[in-house]
Curated annotation (Swiss-Prot):
The keyword Iron does not apply. E3 ubiquitin-protein ligase that acts in the endoplasmic reticulum (ER)-associated degradation (ERAD) pathway, which targets misfolded proteins that accumulate in the endoplasmic reticulum (ER) for ubiquitination and subsequent proteasome-mediated degradation. Protects cells from ER stress-induced apoptosis. The gene is rnft1. Its main location: endoplasmic reticulum. Pathway: Protein modification; protein ubiquitination. Residues 27-45 have a biased composition (Polar residues). GO terms for biological process: positive regulation of ERAD pathway; protein ubiquitination. This is E3 ubiquitin-protein ligase RNFT1.
Amino acid sequence: MKHRPVHERQCSTETKNWKENTQLIMQSSSGHTHHQPGSNDSPSVCMSLPVPQLSAEGSCTAGDVTIDLSSPESHHGARSSSRRVRPGNGRSLSRHGHTHSHDANGPEDANDADSREQSNSISEVFHFYKWLEKSFPYILIFSAKLVVQHITGISVGIGLLTTFLYANKCIVNQVFLRDKCSKLQCLWILVFLLFSSLLLYYTFSSQALYYSLVFMNPSLGPLHFFDALWVVGITDFIGKFFFMGLKCIILLVPSFVMSHKSKGYWYMALEEVAQCYCMLVSTPVWFRYLIDYGNQNSGAEWHFGILLALLYLILKLLIIFGQRKTSSNSLRLFLTQPNYGAAATKSQCSEVDGMCAICQAEFIKPIVLVCQHVFCEECISLWFNKEKTCPLCRTVISNQSHKWKDGATSLQLRIF
C-alpha cells in the first residue's frame, strides 16, 4: 500500500470537514428562506461559508465562499429588496420608538418641573419663616423703642378712637328709638364730644392744631412725615366729632317740629358733608409736607417737591370728581325728600284691620305703597333706611341709596 504525502492527507481531511460543515449549514438555513415579491416561487438562499483555499504551493488556507442556490435574477432581486426594505424598517421602528419615548416622558417632565417649582416655593417660605424667627427678638426691641418714642401719639389715637366708637354707637341707638330716645343721653353725648375736643386742643395748645380745621397750617416747625400724620389724624377725628354733635342736636329736636323721616335725610346729608370735609381738610398739611420750604437746600429739591405736590393735587381732584355723583344724589334726595306712596284711605286701612304690619299698632299717618300694602309713614321710612323692598311682598319700591339715614358715622380715616 502506497503512502500519500503528508500534505495530501491534510488537504483530504480538511476537505471532508468542509463538506460536513456545508451540509449542516445548508440544513439549518433551509428554514430561513424568504419569498420575495416579484420573483419566482422557488426560494433563494445566500450563504457565506468558510472554505479552504489552496495556494500556489499546494497548501490549504481558510477563506469565505458564497453559495448561490437560486437563479441569478431571483438572487439579485432578493438581495436588492432586502437591502431596500431592512434599513427602512429599522429607521421607521427607530422613529416610532423615539416618538413613543417622547410621548411617555412629556407628562413626567412636566410633573417633575411642577414639583420642583412647588418645592422651591415651599423652601423660600420656609427660609423666610426661619429668618423671621431669628429676627423676631430684634424686631421686638426696635418696635418697643418706636412705641416709646411715639407713646403720646399712640395714646391720643387710642383715646380718640374709643371716644368715636362710644359716641357713634349711642347716636345710632337713639335714632333707632325715635320717640322713645333719651334727651338726656343725647345731651350727654354732645357735651362729652365737646369736652374731649377742647381738652385735646388745650393740651397741645402750643402747636395750634385747631388752625388745620380752617385749612391753615398749625404752628409747627418743618413738617416731617409723623408730624403731618399727627396733625391730619387729630383733625380728622375732631371733624367727625363736630358733625356727630350736629346729629345730637337734630336728635334733640321734637318730632312734631321735625319728623323722623326728615331727620333721616338730615343725617344722610350731614354724613356726606362730613366725608367731603375730612377729605379736603388734610390737603394743606400734606401739600406743605411735600414742598417742605424749611428744609430745601437746593433748587433741584425745591422743584422736585413742587412736582410731588402737583401730583398730589391732581390725585385729590380725581378722587373728588369720582365722588361727585354720590354726593349729588344725596343732596338731591335731601332737597326733594321723595315719598314712598300716597296717603291711605279709611277703607284701605280697614282691609288690614287698622293695624300696621311693622309696629303692630294702630296706623299713624298711614300710606299705601305701589304694591297696595299699607304702613305707618314713620315705620316704612325707618324700614327703607336699610331696605329697598316692601316688607310683605318684596316688591322693589325705591332704587335709591339711603345710606347713613340711621345716624351712623363712617369710621374711615381720611388720612391723605
